[in-house]
A protein has these predicted regions:
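Long, compositionally biased, glycine/small-hydrophobic-enriched stretches that function as flexible linkers
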Residues: 27-29, 52-55, 60, 66-79, ...
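Low-complexity, glycine/alanine/valine/leucine- and proline-rich hydrophobic stretches
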Residues: 37-73, 158, 162-184
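Acidic, aliphatic-rich amphipathic alpha-helical segments
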Residues: 1-39, 80, 84-164
Length: 184
């Protein structure tokens, strides 16, 4: 879900407004034991997530995928091992962005009546699903079994006249690229 922050910051005026107050770039790394890790770099103009532990301002290790899911659900409070001086970013900017992401990803029926909001919610849900497909193929035992049968190449995953993504398969490892493939 956190990878969808990229798209939120790109597509949503409220998220852009939240980031506009950022004085300098801040990067946050989530490192899940026996699970995925990613580093998200935030700037005034948006954010970018990269797989893996990268150079970061804030480092948050998590002991399991369940703990990470708890962080996402708000039932687990993460404890940074690095970046305590940047706690203000986590408590204000990061929390405001994730709250906005939750608002868009778990919309009320009333909010969905607004066509622009409906389209934003649909796009963000699509991008969340596209990234989840790769994560499942790489991290889940059944997903890994399925990926073991996949040939190298690009898979087009899209909504007609809407958002598109490429699921790139290389040596049974899946990567999501948030654009339509050149040669599906």
């Amino acid at each position: 879900v956190l990878g969808t922050l990229e798209n939120l910051c790109e597509l949503d005026d409220k998220a852009k407004e939240i980031l506009s107050g950022l004085k300098k770039p801040v990067s946050v790394c989530f490192d899940v034991k026996h699970g995925p890790s990613a580093t998200i770099k935030f700037t005034k103009s948006g954010c970018r997530m990269e797989d893996g532990v990268r150079d970061c301002d804030i480092y948050i290790p998590l002991s399991s995928c369940e703990k990470f899911n708890g962080v996402i659900d708000g039932t687990v409070t993460p404890v940074p091992l690095k970046g305590l001086t940047k706690i203000g970013f986590l408590l204000k900017t990061f929390t405001a962005l994730t709250d906005r992401l939750s608002e868009v990803m778990q919309p009320s029926e009333e909010a969905l009546k607004d066509r622009a909001f409906f389209e934003l919610s649909t796009k963000l849900t699509f991008y969340t699903i596209s990234v989840a497909l790769s994560q499942i193929g790489n991290q889940d035992k059944i997903g890994q079994a399925s990926a073991s049968y996949m040939l190298d190449g690009d898979i087009a995953f899209c909504i007609k006249d809407g958002p598109a993504a490429t699921i790139r398969v290389k040596d049974h490892h899946l990567v999501t690229i948030k654009e339509y493939p050149k040669k599906p």
